[in-house]
Swiss-Prot record:
Source organism of the structure: Aphonopelma sp.
Family the entry assigns: Belongs to the neurotoxin 12 (Hwtx-2) family. 06 (TXP1) subfamily.
Name by which UniProt lists this protein: Omega-theraphotoxin-Asp1f
A GO cellular component entry from the record: extracellular region
InterPro entries, per database record: Hwtx-2-like
Length: 39
């Protein structure tokens, strides 16, 4: 699990990169420059 540098509440493929209220990315995503990237 990677910590998000930016607030990343974007949804991609129906899955939130960082769910609201969470401080870290979940579900195999990480945030980079406000983009959700699959890891």
């Amino acid at each position: 699990i990677f910590e998000c540098v930016f607030s990343c509440d974007i949804e991609k493929e129906g899955k939130p990169c960082k769910p609201k209220g969470e401080k870290k990315c979940t579900g195999g995503w990480k945030c980079k420059i406000k983009l959700c990237l699959k890891i």
